[in-house]
Amino acid sequence: MKKILVLEDEENIRSFVVINLKRAGYETVEAGTGEEALAQLKQNPGIRVALLDIMLPDIDGFEVCRRIRAMDNKIGIIMLTARTQEMDKVTGLMTGADDYVTKPFSPAELTGRVHALFRRTGGDEELEADDEVVQPPFRLNTRNRTLEKNGQRVKLTQVEYGIVKLFMENPGKALSREEILDAVWGRDYFGELKIVDVNIRRLRIKIEDDATNPVYITTVWGYGYKWGG
């Protein structure tokens, strides 16, 4: 059974989330503080997705997200944000989250986002016949879901991996934000297009020699992005 960490300090919200995730067939691990969540991750290595509230009584959800990313880049992370806090969404994505859900949210929206994230993190994928994509100086191993630049490993989240894979398999092709969203997040994802832009910004910091002057992931103004100038 797929295991999810639920970090939420308000017990009624946490119970609502847990009940609906269990109804959808997921196993849950609960935490009410950031430190408790980090401890649960160490005790439960089978956790593949984490739902993180931002406002917590000890360390906030952003710091928990940073620490999770330092421990494991393969865990999918969804931030639970207030609808009015636009900067929380951007900050969460830049600290390593894969997605966000704004409060209040419906059970269908929450479970849909979780299901889509499990799919993107590779749990439901079959191994591919061609296990390497090479675009110098990059080498993408689709079997291990890893990226190297000049022989050095680049640490990617699973969403970042999906974006790089899409670009490297379509070199020189302009891809719209909508195409990227559909390919990486899935056609059933109904989030905002800005999630593409924020993930591209984060990805450039990791793979470009100068993120302010990108040469690998370039902008196609008014449309989207492409691999190469």
Which role does the model predict for each range below?
Residues D188-G191:
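Conserved micro-motifs of the catalytic ATP-binding
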Residues R69, F118, M168, R204-E208:
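Protein kinase-like catalytic domain
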Residues A108, K173-V184:
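Short coil-to-helix segment of the ABC ATPase nucleotide-binding domain corresponding to the Q-loop/switch region
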Residues M1-E125:
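N-terminal/domain-start alpha-helical segments
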Residues D130, K155, I200, R204-G229:
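DNA-binding patch around the recognition helix
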Residues K2-K3, A116-A174, E178:
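Short, Lys/Arg-enriched segments at the junction into DNA-binding effector domains
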Residues I163-V164, I180, L203, I207:
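DNA major-groove recognition helices of helix-turn-helix
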